[in-house]
């Protein structure tokens, strides 16, 4: 559909998966319908996913010929003697896990316009005949966008980029810049809390959520320091 475009499946958000379609123009509703229709056609064709395993140098060369340089950097820095890849018709790609036997196994999905990108809706885990209900998560999406901007500052777009940078001896620099970006963001949060108080809207409690061992306690201590620096 778009020979000069590419799609990036990015983050799980709003009970689905946020995707960026990189074109030379904004993504429109017509684009969404065209892609969804093509997806339905591929499912109806019941095309098999085929898995192949070869020497990593051969797989790297295959992706290099396809100009899939993100996969080239990933596999070149993986340290594995052998690597595998999947084919779907004429398409070749890498995936770290297992895939369905064929496209015909996909029975329920939807694709909708979602802000400046797309949202791939998937079935509910407990009720697989129903799609997950879309929950608007504007703040979560903004966090992911900020994460992408930070990666651009660091020059890290993929795991392969990260591995290559570490192999080149830039690990300490990556850590230092990442820490500086985090400290700057925490200071901005502290400033916002301070200014709300100045406007007569004092913040009485700050809630921090995240999974186990995600850095909540460390974040709270760093935020406390910044709040004290703001006079709170």
Language model regions located:
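Walker A (P-loop) phosphate-binding loop of P-loop NTPases
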Residues: 213
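Short coil/loop residues immediately preceding or within conserved phosphate-binding loops
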Residues: 203
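Conserved lysine of the Walker
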Residues: 216
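Hydrophobic anchor at the beta1->P-loop junction of P-loop NTPases
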Residues: 206-208
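Hydrophobic positions on the alpha1 helix immediately C-terminal to the Walker A/P-loop
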Residues: 219, 223
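Active/ligand-binding-proximal structured segments within catalytic/core domains
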Residues: 1
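Auxiliary tRNA-acceptor-end handling modules of aminoacyl-tRNA synthetases
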Residues: 6-14, 18-199
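Short beta-strand-centered segment that lines the nucleotide-binding/catalytic pocket of NTP-utilizing
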Residues: 229-232
């Amino acid at each position: 559909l778009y020979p000069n475009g590419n799609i990036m499946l990015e983050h799980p958000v709003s009970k689905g998966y946020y995707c960026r379609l990189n074109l030379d123009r904004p993504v429109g509703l017509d684009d969404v319908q065209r892609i969804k229709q093509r997806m339905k056609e591929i499912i109806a064709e019941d095309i098999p996913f085929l898995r192949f395993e070869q020497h990593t140098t051969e797989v790297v060369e295959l992706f290099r010929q396809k100009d899939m340089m993100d996969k080239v950097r990933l596999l070149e820095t993986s340290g594995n003697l052998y690597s595998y890849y999947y084919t779907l018709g004429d398409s070749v790609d890498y995936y770290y896990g297992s895939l369905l036997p064929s496209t015909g196994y996909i029975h329920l999905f939807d694709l909708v316009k979602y802000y400046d990108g797309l949202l791939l809706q998937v079935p509910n885990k407990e009720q697989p005949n129903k799609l997950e209900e879309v929950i608007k998560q504007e703040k979560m999406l903004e966090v992911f966008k900020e994460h992408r901007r930070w990666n651009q500052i660091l020059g890290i777009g993929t795991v392969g980029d990260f591995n290559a940078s570490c192999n080149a001896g830039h690990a300490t620099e990556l850590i230092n810049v990442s820490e500086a970006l985090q400290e700057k963001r925490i200071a901005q949060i502290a400033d916002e809390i301070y200014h709300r108080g100045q406007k007569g809207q004092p913040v009485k409690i700050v809630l921090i959520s995240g999974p186990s061992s995600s850095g909540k306690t460390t974040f709270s201590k760093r935020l406390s320091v910044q709040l004290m620096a703001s006079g709170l």
